[in-house]
Amino acid sequence: MRIARRWVGAGLMVMGGLASPALAQNLFVVTATGNGNTVTVGGDSIIDLVDSAVNTQDQFAQFQDVNATFALNYGGIADAITITKNSGNTQASLTFGPTGTTRTFTGTSQDDLENQIEDYLKKQGGADFTAFLKAVNAQSVIAVSDGNPNATTARMAGWAFDRFGFSADQRKAYTLRPGAAPAPQGAQGGGDPDTGADAPVMERANAGFQLYVGASGQSYSAGDFDGESATIFGAADFNFSTRVGLSLGSFLAYNTVGDADVFHVGLTLGVPVRLVLPGEATPFTWQVTPFGQVGGSGSEDIGAGGLIIGGGITSYLAWHISDRWTLAMANQYTHYEGEKLSFSDFEIDPGVSQGVMKHGLRVSCRLTECWYAYAGASYSTFTDDASIDSWVSPAVGVGYGSIAGSGVQIGFIGDYGDDYSASGFRIAGNLVF
C-alpha cells in the first residue's frame, strides 16, 4: 500500500506527543502480520519507521500484496495504533487503542484509498487525534507535551515557580543606599557583631531595570530510558516602584531520550506585586505574581509537537528570622491548554488540558555580608491525569549578592517521582543597572 509520505509524516506529527519504552532499545516498534508471516521492527524515529511499514518498504516489502495488519507499540503502549489493509490495497481501517476509536476507509483504487485517508488526516481526524494524545500523555513517563517532570507543561510551570517563588530573592525589588532611616530587618547591611560598630543607616531605593540569565543541565531516567536535558533562560525586569514590577522571561530547552531529540520553548510575562516589605515591625516579605505564558515543543524523531498557552499565580512569603537566617515558602498554581496549529491544510493539537500545583520551602543563611548558602525542596503535582502525577525537587547551593542587588547562584537540583529521577546543576545571575 503505497501511501504518500507527505500524509504519513503530517499525520504522525499530529499523533505524536509522547515517547517511552517500547523495547529496551527502541522508542517505537511496528509488528506486521500477514500471509502467515510476522515481522517486528523497532526504531527511535516514528516517521521513518511507520513510513516504511504503511508503504510496505524495506523489511515490510513482503506485505505489499497480501492482507496485513500493522500494530504500533507507541511509547510502551501496545497496539496504540493498528492499521489493517486488504491485499488489493483498496480497504483499510485505523484504530486508536487508548481511545478505542476505529475509522474504516474503502476506495475504488489504491490512489482513491490514499486520498480518503489524507482527507481524514487533514479534516475530520483532528478530534480523534486530540483525544488519542490526551489518553497516551497520561500513560507515558516521557511524554513530550504533558504528564511528567520533563514535559513542556512542567517546564513552563517550573520556570515561573523558580523565577517568582523558589528563587524569588534573586530578583531585587529594591536596593539599599545611605539614608536617614534604619536598615530594614532582612535587608543586606547591618552592624558588625564582632566590633560592635553601629549599623549603617540605609533606605530603600527602586532597583529599576535588571537582567537575569542562567542555565541548567540534568541527566534523567524515565522508565527504561535515560536522557540528558539542557536549558538556558533569561529575563528582563523593571520595577515601577519598590512594590510593583514587570518581568518578561523565556527559556529554551533541549533534551534527548534514546536517540530522539526534543526541543521546548516558553515565554512568561509576570507582574510581581510586593504586598509586604520587611521593616522593624514586620520581618516579612510577601510577593504575589500573576503571570501569563505561551510555550511549545517539537520533535521530528518522535513526531511530537504543539503550542501550549496558560497562566497562573505565584505567592512568595519570606520570614527574615535574623540578619543571617531567612525561611521562605513559595506556592503556585498554573493551568495550561493546548492550542491548534495549522499548516499545509493540517491541524496539530497537543491534547493538553492540565493544571500544575507547586509548593516549596527554602532556608538561606548569610555566611558573610555578601555570601550565603541555601537549601530547600518543592513538591509538584498535576491536577489532571498524568503518567507521573507528583514529584519532589530538592535544591542546595551557594550564592553571592551585592548590596547593589547584582549576584549569582550555583547549586544542585533534582527531580524525583515514581519511575522518574533527574539530577544536575543550575547557575543563574542577576545584574541590576
What are these model-derived regions, one by one?
Residues 1-206:
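Cleavable N-terminal export/targeting peptides
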Residues 199-208, 238-246, 275-286, 319-327, ...:
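Short loop/turn motifs that connect adjacent beta-strands in outer-membrane beta-barrel proteins
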Residues 209, 246, 339-433:
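Outer membrane beta-barrel transmembrane domains
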Residues 215-221, 238, 250-258, 273-275, ...:
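Transmembrane beta-strands of outer-membrane beta-barrel pores
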Residues 228-273:
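Long, hydrophobic/aromatic-enriched structural stretches that serve as scaffold segments
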Residues 232-234, 267-271, 311-315, 359-361, ...:
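Membrane-embedded beta-strands of outer-membrane beta-barrel proteins
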Residues 282-289, 293-380:
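Detector for outer-membrane/organellar transmembrane beta-barrel domains
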